């Protein structure tokens, strides 16, 4: 999709679920920090604007974009978060290093989404020039950090709704006698 002269960070605030009870982790690459800090500011502003309390936001820094995978994994394992936003920036250079890092980070974040039950939002700019990154981190094309924060809220909400739906399905099966619990089972009917 062409994005020339379009600000992609505009969104309908009425379409955003209530986020006041969600907790978010943000893992930020220190490489290209003039860009990643802009993305972080966009994410923080969007989360706060959508009623996420500041104390429900945890930030960790990692050295580079490739380390976002490990940082996000550890955030998922050790912090009680509803979603993680991985923020990074890789800019094309003279070697294939760009391709390897972009592919590795993309696959790593994808793997975390497949292997865990907590969404990890990909907010890694993979641009050909510094100007393209500037344009997407608070410039003429908006702020991908803002978009990532909105995606994180929506995905946390989907996760919450799926969990509630699963609980209701189990309760329905129990009440219908379709499944039976052994004594001491962790699944209980809530009235």
Model-predicted regions and their roles:
Residues 2-5, 98-99, 103-191:
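C-terminal binding/interaction regions
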Residues 12-62:
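Glycine-rich phosphate/diphosphate-binding loop of Rossmann-like nucleotide-binding domains
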Residues 6-11:
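N-terminal charged helix/coil linker that caps or initiates catalytic domains
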């Amino acid at each position: 999709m062409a994005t020339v002269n379009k600000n992609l960070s505009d969104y309908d605030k009425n379409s955003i679920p209530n986020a006041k009870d969600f907790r978010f982790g943000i893992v930020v690459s220190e490489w290209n920090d003039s860009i990643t800090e802009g993305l972080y500011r966009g994410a923080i502003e969007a989360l706060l604007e959508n009623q996420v309390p500041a104390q429900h936001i945890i930030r960790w820094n990692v050295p580079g974009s490739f380390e976002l995978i490990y940082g996000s994994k550890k955030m998922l394992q050790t912090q009680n978060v509803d979603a993680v936003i991985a923020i990074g920036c890789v800019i094309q250079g003279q070697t294939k290093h760009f391709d390897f890092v972009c592919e590795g980070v993309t696959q790593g974040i994808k793997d975390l989404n497949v292997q865990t039950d907590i969404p990890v939002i990909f907010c890694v700019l993979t641009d050909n020039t510094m100007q393209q990154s500037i344009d997407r981190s608070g410039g003429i094309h908006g702020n991908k950090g803002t978009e990532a924060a909105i995606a994180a809220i929506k995905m946390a909400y989907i996760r919450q709704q799926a969990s509630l739906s699963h609980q209701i399905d189990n309760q329905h099966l129990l009440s219908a006698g379709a499944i039976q619990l052994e004594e001491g089972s962790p699944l209980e009917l809530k009235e």
